[in-house]
């Protein structure tokens, strides 16, 4: 997917694939932070949750945001890979849920948004 396609909105007021990708990166970061007890405020973009895609879209900015998604995905995978069975039942840092529930939740979140992006790609064919 190129920058132009990633920035197409399926309808006015709806998120495009670019915004969904950065949103997914943010929540991978948030889950990683809670798994590792890192401090807040270290995400690569100011703000939280949803981030506007740049206007006009550029390939360089798109590649940068895809790299951001990959980076936070790898960080999260490394944190999850380092968990032991006993860790799954302990409370995640900064919340009421367990580590196991946090991991299942971020996996479900990722799948949901990956599906959205696949649907957007089909709409753009």
Model-derived regions: residue spans:
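Residues that cap or delimit alpha-helices
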Residues: 1-2, 84
